[in-house]
Amino acid sequence: MQINVVKTFLFALAASSVSALAVDTEFRCGAPEPSEELIEASAIMAVAEAEAAANGTLAARQSALTIDTYVHVVATSTSASAGYLSDATIQQQLRVMNEDYAPSGIQFVLKGTDRTVNANWARDSGETAMKTALRKGTYKDLNLYFLSSIPGGILGYCYFPASATTSTVRLDGCTIASGTVPGGSISRFNLGKTAVHEVGHWFGLYHTFQGGCNGQGDLVDDTPAQASASSGCPIGRDSCPNQPGLDPIHNYMDYSDDSCYEEFTPGQNARMSSMFAQFRAGK
């Protein structure tokens, strides 16, 4: 969303209530609210990115990243219908992620896969116990947990970056419904894009509709204002007609159908690099 504001305003925003940037989980994503720490970091980064965009150096803020990735398949049984994903399906999912993140300079390298049959964990009950048992790597490594189902119709959720403490590292990663993988059982959302969306949160991106038409939105300057989440692929939607640009329905951080997703913006690319450098690199 456009954030043509001065530094002093952004720093004031960073100190304001987190509730103004609460993440909408109604449709498909259960990501938690961004913390005050993250909002403050986003505001500071937004200033630097706006200055870089103005002088033509925004692309230089984007870094090439290779992310070690661990996949945990947690299902109610060993049947494919229960979400017990095959190696081939996992490779397809990683291929989608690598294709979609390639313009951002980000690639994911599969370092390990494990499979667990646990009826409670597979329905997203006992998250802390599950992640304590299964999580691998450090805070800079991505852990993906594919579950048979997530309550409330949620397709996935992921934790934003934060200062690396024992608890934040333990819970870190993305939890995703197995039916969203390529060829999965959830129609409209079975091209593997839910993982792309959720990993965007892992890199510190908010939803494009954050804050609606009049708030400060996702604190990324080149994502147009958006009143609410998209559904389907509503070409030409303009939910904030008094703000520049049409709704970013093709952006991975909206709620469009998988077939509608196409891009991250240059500002989002720079933000992901900045967030990784501040919160995850070397952790």
Curated annotation (Swiss-Prot):
The EC number(s) this enzyme carries: 3.4.24.-
Gene3D superfamilies: Collagenase (Catalytic Domain)
SUPFAM superfamilies: Metalloproteases ('zincins'), catalytic domain
Keyword Cell inner membrane part of the UniProt annotation: no
Binding of Zn(2+), residues: 197, 201
Record-level GO BP terms: proteolysis
Pfam families, per the entry: Peptidase_M43 (PF05572)
Keyword Hydrolase: yes
Main location as per UniProt: secreted
Similarity comment: family membership: Belongs to the peptidase M43B family.
Active site annotation, chain numbering: 198
Record key words, sorted: Disulfide bond, Glycoprotein, Hydrolase, Metal-binding, Metalloprotease, Protease, Secreted, Signal, Zinc
Protein name per its UniProtKB record: Extracellular metalloprotease MGG_08041
Disulfide bonds: 233-260
One GO CC term, this protein: extracellular region
Function: Secreted metalloproteinase that allows assimilation of proteinaceous substrates.
Secretion signal span: 1-22
